Amino acid sequence: IIIGHMLNFEGTHADVFEVFIQIGAILAIYTHYRRTFNGFLKRKNWIKTRGVSLLHISAGMLPVLMAGYLMQYIIKEYLFGPIPVIVGLIIGAIFMIYAEKRTVSGRLVDSVNNLTIYQCFQIGLYQMLCLWPGFSRSGATIAGGMLIGCTRRAAADFSFIMAVPVMIIVCVYDLEIGRAHV
């Protein structure tokens, strides 16, 4: 957003370009976690009590998708400028430092397979911070996971597994919106 503003590359075409950039990230994450994603294709893994399931992923995605949809006008109108993005970067960095210092001590969730559906939902609530452009989605979810009692590894694994469906949904939505404006 900041570079796009400096180069005067803004508007619908820039939005579509940003969507296509995300495809590389989606493919990289999918490649790394392909066993987990391929496991989701089995119906028995859609809803299960042990290990990460589609239900866990859905619980994590729900807050950000609903908030993003409901607040899309406000976000696009007021937060997609260089100054709000810089503020988001700074606040995001402070939040991640805070999470490092305030990580819950004691018994930590040490694997993505040990997350409860409620914990996934809580991480999803933290993910809403990334609706502020500049605030890192992975930073928000990893830091949020650490604040609710996950190890950095468990929070990162869940963050990246959850990223693929979220980014796919956002990309498809943005492409459809972009197509409507072309």
Where are these regions (language model features)?
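Multi-pass membrane proteins that catalyze or facilitate reactions on polyprenyl-/lipid-phosphate substrates
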Residues: 1-179
